[in-house]
């Protein structure tokens, strides 16, 4: 069965073959029961994740694939839904941030109709790491295509209400307050892949990749 691991292993193939593999992989992902889909993370090595990012870039060559999304909340076109929870793994966490290699995220809709999220870490040093979700079409630094961006900002989300059990926002510590963003590509149902950048608040600051690429798989059975 071709799943993301097989897709990543085909990076030496021509781009038209990449696209065929992306289409087939998406169909295979649909065949995996939702409650078992998060197990994909355990089947992948960190080296596979950058290849998945690269290969999902071919999705934009197909008009139909380019419109497909990984989840309802990330479609940015819903009215009211409960939060979604995702399991995430990076290709390489920077030192001294190796604890960021595996984490969880939550996506939720605010009363204002916008979409937001937070990174959920085991470490309590960094508190609640909230972000805003926006639709974008390309990465600023590379001009590569993408679907969304997670913008961390200063962390002080001005919302009148948060999902039950969510902590009160707090000011982000460095480097999360240094215009940290994660660009997102839809990879398949319940699966997205991201690329994190520290773009910097200073105009003359050169953007740099933060923690490589990040594979994110929706967890259909977990909550906080």
State where each predicted segment sits.
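Soluble ligand-binding/transfer domains with enclosed cavities or grooves
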Residues: 1-224
């Amino acid at each position: 069965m071709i799943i993301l691991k097989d897709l990543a292993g085909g990076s030496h193939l021509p781009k038209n073959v990449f696209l065929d593999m992306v289409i087939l992989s998406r169909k295979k992902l649909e065949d995996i029961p939702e409650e078992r889909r998060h197990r994909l993370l355990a089947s992948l090595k960190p080296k596979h994740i950058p290849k998945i990012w690269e290969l999902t870039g071919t999705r934009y060559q197909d008009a139909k694939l380019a419109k497909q999304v990984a989840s309802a909340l990330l479609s940015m076109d819903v009215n009211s839904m409960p939060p979604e929870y995702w399991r995430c793994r990076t290709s390489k966490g920077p030192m001294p941030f190796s604890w960021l290699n595996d984490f969880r995220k939550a996506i939720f809709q605010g009363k204002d109709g916008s979409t937001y999220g937070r990174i959920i870490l085991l470490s309590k040093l960094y508190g609640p790491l909230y972000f805003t979700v926006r639709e974008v079409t390309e990465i600023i630094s590379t001009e590569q295509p993408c679907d969304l961006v997670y913008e961390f900002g200063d962390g002080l989300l001005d919302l009148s209400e948060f999902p039950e059990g969510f902590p009160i926002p707090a000011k982000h510590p460095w480097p999360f307050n240094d215009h940290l963003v994660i660009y997102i590509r839809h990879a398949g149902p319940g699966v997205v892949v991201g690329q994190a950048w520290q773009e910097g608040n200073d105009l003359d600051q050169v953007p740099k990749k933060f923690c490589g690429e990040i594979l994110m798989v929706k967890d259909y059975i977990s909550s906080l």
